């Protein structure tokens, strides 16, 4: 991670860390790196429903206009909506203003290249290098060569048309409850499922600039769980603030996470001969029950580091078309280039419609192993991988598990923590294994 770009673009508290001044520079230098070979490059900008979105959009637009770009403002739209439209409209770049599932005071800026994919580490490094130069030597067009800005609020409709084409048939007879996190999908999701003839009940669809992700959305699925039962819905679909994640709820109110959705969809796609190489890409944090369920269905799996960008990289490299994370970032590369909550919802609904089975029955085919994750604050998180005593206790626990469990000990990507995760046959065994390892990590390198 660099000075400005983290694991998912530039993030910070809006107007404190992520200031308009910084947003201007990100627009100017980011726009230049992505479009420098083009005369009057086209750049799309979308935002979620945060109050700070207008302020940051204004600064970003100014930065892009200063390099001569033609900016098209999409208004409130999901992150995957920007990604899709950037490629579909032959734009040189796309920008999304959002901090995803984070609280309202945060915001972020995320770029997409003309191919609809997130930037490479090298591109981000070049943007940072230019931003930190003592003198701004970028071209400064004048007169008729200055940039132009236009609104293209029809972009959302174009994206919805694309999504509707991914439905195998209409959803007549399915009662779906939607939780849109008071975010970017608040209008999109409601129209999408109504247009596909589902019976729709909604919550979290009244954004006021301040209530995004506030007790609603994919990070608070318990709210949707209660709503599904209250409305007697067949299933619930919860999106996050920028619409790139999906967590579902079955008709009984049970939460169905990203691993389960991935399993359900990949099994169905395999049965139709549409799963490339019968392989799914996931991260090391996916549940052991996920891998065992895939194995039973003859589906292979590839594991990556945590982060949807690493999942996408592995998919692109070897041509796989389904991947994702337990958190609900699910990528269907035949259709879009990034995690897409609405697209994932349609893939799940396609499966429900084709099988005629309730979501609870489909989800029950994957038996989740009890999982426990404990964070330990340490002096040097990177030393955990070479500590002999830690290695010894991990080896001891793995021997006891005898293949019926899994241990993962890794440094956090963003904080001075070591994450200790175990999965085992029972919750009691899980607790015991994690506590044994945590004890050794604390005594060897823990902070008091």
Curated annotation (Swiss-Prot):
UniProt xrefs under InterPro entries: A-D-PHexomutase_a/b/a-I, A-D-PHexomutase_a/b/a-I/II/III, A-D-PHexomutase_a/b/a-II, A-D-PHexomutase_a/b/a-III, A-D-PHexomutase_C, A-D-PHexomutase_C_sf, A-D-PHexomutase_CS, Alpha-D-phosphohexomutase_SF
Enzyme Commission number(s): 5.4.2.10
Catalytic activity: alpha-D-glucosamine 1-phosphate = D-glucosamine 6-phosphate
Modification type Phosphoserine: residues: 100
Span of the signal peptide: none
Binding of Mg(2+), residues: 100, 240, 242, 244
Superkingdom of the organism of origin: Bacteria
Recorded GO MF terms: magnesium ion binding; phosphoglucosamine mutase activity; phosphomannomutase activity
Presence of keyword Isomerase: yes
Induction: Constitutively expressed, part of the cdaA-cdaR-glmM-glmS operon.
CDD domains per the UniProt record, alphabetical: GlmM
GO biological process: carbohydrate metabolic process; peptidoglycan biosynthetic process; UDP-N-acetylglucosamine biosynthetic process
Cofactor descriptive note: Binds 1 Mg(2+) ion per subunit.
Gene3D superfamilies hit by this protein: Alpha-D-Glucose-1,6-Bisphosphate, subunit A, domain 3, Alpha-D-phosphohexomutase, C-terminal domain
GO cellular component: cytosol
Cofactor section: Mg(2+)
Top EC class of this enzyme: isomerase
Homology family: Belongs to the phosphohexose mutase family.
Function: Catalyzes the conversion of glucosamine-6-phosphate to glucosamine-1-phosphate. Glucosamine-1-phosphate is used for cell wall biosynthesis.
Protein name: Phosphoglucosamine mutase
UniProt organism field: Bacillus subtilis (strain 168)
Encoding gene (name): glmM
């Amino acid at each position: 991670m660099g000075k400005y770009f983290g694991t998912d673009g530039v993030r910070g508290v809006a107007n404190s860390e992520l200031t308009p001044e910084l947003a201007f520079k990100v627009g100017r230098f980011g726009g230049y790196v992505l479009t420098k070979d083009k005369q009057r490059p086209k750049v799309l900008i979308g935002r979620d429903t945060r109050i700070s979105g207008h302020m940051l959009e204004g600064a970003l637009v100014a930065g892009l206009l200063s390099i001569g770009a033609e900016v098209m403002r999409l208004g409130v739209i999901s992150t995957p909506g920007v990604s899709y439209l950037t490629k579909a409209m032959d734009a040189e770049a796309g920008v999304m203003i959002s901090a995803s599932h984070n609280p309202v005071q945060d915001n972020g800026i995320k770029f997409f290249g003309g191919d609809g994919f997130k930037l490479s580490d090298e591109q981000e490094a070049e943007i940072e290098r230019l931003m930190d130069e003592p003198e701004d030597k970028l071209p400064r067009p004048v007169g008729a060569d200055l940039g132009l800005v236009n609104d293209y609020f029809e972009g959302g409709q174009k994206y919805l048309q694309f999504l509707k084409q991914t439905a195998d048939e209409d959803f007549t007879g399915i009662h779906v409850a939607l939780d849109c996190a008071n975010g970017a999908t608040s209008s999109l999701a409601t129209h999408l499922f109504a247009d596909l003839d589902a019976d729709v009940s909604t919550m979290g669809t009244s954004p006021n600039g301040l209530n995004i992700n506030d007790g609603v959305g994919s990070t608070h699925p318990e709210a949707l769980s209660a709503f599904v039962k209250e409305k007697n819905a067949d299933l619930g679909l919860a999106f996050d603030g920028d619409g790139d994640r999906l967590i579902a709820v079955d008709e009984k109110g049970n939460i169905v996470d990203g691993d389960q959705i991935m399993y359900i969809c990949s099994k169905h796609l395999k049965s139709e001969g549409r799963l490339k190489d019968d392989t799914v890409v996931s991260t090391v944090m996916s549940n052991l029950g996920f891998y065992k369920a895939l194995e039973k269905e003859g589906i292979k799996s590839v594991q990556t580091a945590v982060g949807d960008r690493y999942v996408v990289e592995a998919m692109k490299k070897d041509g796989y078309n389904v991947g994702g994370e337990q958190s609900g970032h699910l990528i269907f590369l035949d259709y879009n280039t990034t995690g897409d909550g609405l697209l994932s919802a349609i893939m799940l609904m396609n499966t429900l419609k084709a099988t005629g089975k309730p979501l609870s029955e489909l989800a029950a085919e994957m038996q989740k192993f009890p999982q426990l994750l404990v964070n330990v604050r340490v002096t040097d998180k990177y030393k955990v991988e070479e500590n002999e005593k830690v290695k010894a206790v991990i080896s001891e626990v793995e021997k006891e598990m005898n293949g019926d469990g899994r241990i993962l000990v890794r440094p956090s990507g963003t904080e001075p923590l070591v994450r200790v995760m175990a999965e085992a046959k029972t919750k009691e065994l899980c607790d015991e294994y994690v506590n044994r390892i945590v004890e050794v990590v604390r005594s060897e390198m823990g902070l008091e």
